[in-house]
């Protein structure tokens, strides 16, 4: 069963890298993925919220702090699982492949944590926030630097930690 799940994961990655591959989309997603490194876009959004919403500043700062907390937790899981980045014969990743481990995706984890935490503060924007997080997660296998299961696990970790952290403040 595990072998068939891994094979399905690999096949989906191959399909993303071959059948759906478009140069312009790759460039746009690579630029967008850069904003997700270390959760920087989510931290910046939460800090901007803290600047403009003084009444709820502490909650915004808590949201900003939740992103690196999620990154740290995600790193711990990577060290336990130790899954290597995808290497597909004849199908190169877009840009440089990070030297770090693959499972789970930190981009997905920090994006879903950020969307969850910020979404508690601006409920009308939740669909857009989760859409932005989903696009960030999608970018990773599309660019060839993660398996689809890496981003699913990262999204789950980010959502769960985001909800836990939101409940703690």
Predicted features, each with a name:
Residues 1-43, 74-100:
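N-terminal transmembrane-helix/juxtamembrane module of multi-pass inner/ER membrane proteins
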Residues 90-169:
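Membrane-embedded catalytic cores of phosphoryl/pyrophosphoryl-handling enzymes
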Residues 24-25, 55-59, 87-88, 122-128:
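Membrane-helix interface segments
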């Amino acid at each position: 069963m595990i072998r068939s799940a891994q094979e399905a994961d690999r096949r989906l990655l191959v399909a993303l890298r071959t059948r759906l591959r478009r140069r312009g989309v790759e460039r746009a997603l690579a630029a967008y993925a850069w904003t997700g490194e270390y959760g920087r876009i989510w931290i910046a959004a939460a800090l901007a919220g803290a600047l403009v919403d003084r009444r709820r500043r502490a909650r915004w700062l808590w949201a900003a702090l939740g992103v690196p907390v999620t990154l740290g937790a995600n790193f711990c899981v990577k060290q336990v699982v130790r899954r290597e980045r995808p290497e597909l014969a004849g199908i190169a990743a877009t840009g440089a492949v990070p030297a770090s481990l693959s499972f789970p995706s930190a981009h997905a984890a920090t994006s879903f944590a950020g969307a969850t935490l910020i979404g508690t503060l601006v409920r009308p924007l939740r669909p857009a926030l989760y859409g932005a997080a989903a696009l960030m997660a999608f970018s990773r296998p599309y660019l060839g630097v993660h398996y689809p299961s890496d981003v699913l696990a990262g999204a789950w970790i980010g959502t769960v930690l985001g909800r836990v952290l939101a409940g703690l403040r």
